[in-house]
UniProtKB/Swiss-Prot annotation:
Name of this chain's protein: Protamine-2
Region (Disordered) location: 15-41, 66-102
Protein family per UniProt: Belongs to the protamine P2 family.
GO biological processes: chromosome condensation; nucleus organization; spermatid development; spermatogenesis
Keyword Nucleus on entry: yes
Processing and modification events after translation: Proteolytic processing into mature chains is required for histone eviction during spermatogenesis. Transition proteins (TNP1 and TNP2) are required for processing.
Keyword Nucleus: yes
The protein's assembly and partners: Interacts with TDRP.
GO cellular component: nucleosome; nucleus
Protein localization: Nucleus; Chromosome
Top-level taxon in the UniProt lineage: Eukaryota
Pfam family, one: Protamine_P2
GO molecular function: DNA binding
Length: 102
């Protein structure tokens, strides 16, 4: 399957190269279509489906890490504000409430 796809891609590149020799405008137009066409994107994802899976996995990990970092930073801010302002405990409590909402 991979060999067939590679052959088709090489044949297309030769066709585009021939069109550039005959007419440059047509060649550029075809190249733009090849770069942006959704059909080729689907073919690329089929031939290399593992790349799509990796993207999902990475995004999940990144989102999880970002979420954890936000929580940690929130806790650090709470502790720092509590230690810094021991006299003003009312302000600290309101900050905790806003932190829990996020």
């Amino acid at each position: 399957m991979v060999r067939y796809c590679v052959r088709s891609l090489s044949e297309r590149s030769h066709e585009v190269y021939g069109q550039q020799l005959h007419g440059q405008e047509q060649g550029h137009h075809d190249q733009e279509e090849q770069g942006l066409s959704p059909e080729q994107v689907e073919v690329y994802e089929r031939t290399q489906g593992h790349s799509h899976y990796r993207r999902r996995h990475c995004s999940r990990r990144r989102l999880h890490r970002i979420h954890r970092q936000q929580h940690r930073s929130c806790k650090r801010r709470r502790r720092h504000s509590c230690r810094h302002r021991r006299k003003h405990r009312r302000g600290c409590r309101t900050r905790r409430r806003t932190c829990r909402r996020h």
